[in-house]
């Protein structure tokens, strides 16, 4: 989830045949090493990035790529990964190299070493890296004449040897790709002798001095190529930026992100947990978390009813044939839990008397919704038919990628499937996108852009013509929204292209949230039909959509967005009464009863803690409204407000206090209440 902005694209420059891209950059007077916007590579018209040492055979127009752009940072981080690998092999000569790609906001490199890296190791490696950067080693591209030459050179690097034969197109495998097998050598800038090298397709910065700021952040175990049947390696993570200022901002952001980590807040606020007895990626929600979750669902349910959705419910398991028909077993089996073979009957000798059947936990709700549609004849007058379900699904995620609530194995989706005529398709998509954006805004998420995921040429069903029509329709609807639209080539599910809403949180991080998929294929596979106005039988168009993605993921994102301080309408405890002394508890109980009668969630703190301690405790629990009462308040029939920002309003008549609280909640304000805001709302 990248948070840094990219500059506007630079104007193109011309590189003359037989000269380097770097020379053209210098001749154009563009920024060089040391500037945050230093040009680090250039981009050809087809999007390919080239080193500044690249020499074209013919005159060519290229776009300079600065260090403070997304691509520029990616190149710097990839080069920093090489510097890390060199440092590791200098300090740990027995280390074997895995892969080392740039990733969002950083990079990593995997190593096969005898033991795990320690914090002291990372300090030593960082020191070694600083020396390599200071030396200004040159990055030089070298083309292997043959695979045999590469294998001879890499004979002592078993993981690199495996990559020589790699044809997967994995974007994290920076070692190979394109039509050439290449290495990047690090050269002594004075003697040009080779100091170190790595199998790599590039591109890279000109010298190590183009890495102005970096830091190693942590290490962990990681399976080779993410496959738990492979060797367990040690992965070192780091980050690199175009300036020390940018790095410092990023590290501050990391610190704040750690403070907001929903896994940490889930424990501190008693919202949810992940019991070992249940297994990885299977959360349980505690009573307070259950309240937040219910509020999320109830509001969504009400909005869907207003929008004309019809609620359905489907089971958690199904016979195998359903996912044969849908294509999931052919295209999505790796994401499904293993089959359960049940209903077999055996005789006394153990021989099968009646064969059983395979059942699966459902990874998606859509096939079951299609059965509901198909359960009787449908008329064009019924369309669009919008079926909605809070449906539980189960997906096999590798243990290494399971992460809190945002990547789980058991989840509940706010899943809808809309069956429409082709003539209704565009208007339905347009209104659906607006419905999604409005509902996200109601939860306080109102900064977003759109991403258009198109077909994976190796993993799709249906004709190219159908895919082209679906993709173009989604593109037109997305562009008409006025939001930024970013391409995601090959990112679609096997049955149709999709628009995803990428939401920006309070820290500026982007999260994939809602998805809208247009599908012409499933109606064919399930033989879905409706009777048209002319009496003919027609196929409906299918729209898949999930607004939250999953309830669990949305819960996790909101927890971090609000740092656990949920808006009052979502908060598990909306008001807490804090007496100055025990004698004031009955009075606060009366106020609490008044609030409860209006649907407000209230607690009274009658513990033995001192009042100051109680205020600290409930501030830490992110309770939006704290009501204090002492002798003067009781005598005046009033209460005093205390807020999380330490502001306070004293002596508010209790009826006014109740109305202020109820009004704040009913209006679903997503800002935290403060003394000034409550006074303004009450007109005082």
Curated annotation (Swiss-Prot):
What InterPro entries does the entry give? Answer: aa-tRNA-synt_IIb, aa-tRNA-synth_II, aa-tRNA-synth_II/BPL/LPL, Anticodon-bd, Anticodon-bd_dom_sf, TGS, Thr-tRNA-ligase_IIa, Thr/Ala-tRNA-synth_IIc_edit
Return the PROSITE patterns for the record: AA_TRNA_LIGASE_II, TGS
Question: Could you provide one GO biological process annotation from this protein's UniProt record?
Answer: threonyl-tRNA aminoacylation
* Principal localisation: cytoplasm
- How, per the record, is the cofactor bound? Binds 1 zinc ion per subunit.
Region ranges (Catalytic):
261-567
Chain segments annotated as transmembrane: none
Where the record annotates domain TGS, the positions are: 1-66
Q: What does this protein need as cofactor?
A: Zn(2+)
Quaternary arrangement and interactors, per the entry?
Homodimer.
Record's function text = Catalyzes the attachment of threonine to tRNA(Thr) in a two-step reaction: L-threonine is first activated by ATP to form Thr-AMP and then transferred to the acceptor end of tRNA(Thr). Also edits incorrectly charged L-seryl-tRNA(Thr).
UniProt xrefs under HAMAP family: Thr_tRNA_synth (MF_00184)
Quote the protein name from its UniProt record.
Answer: Threonine--tRNA ligase
> From which organism does this entry originate?
Mycobacterium sp. (strain KMS)
Name of the encoding gene: thrS
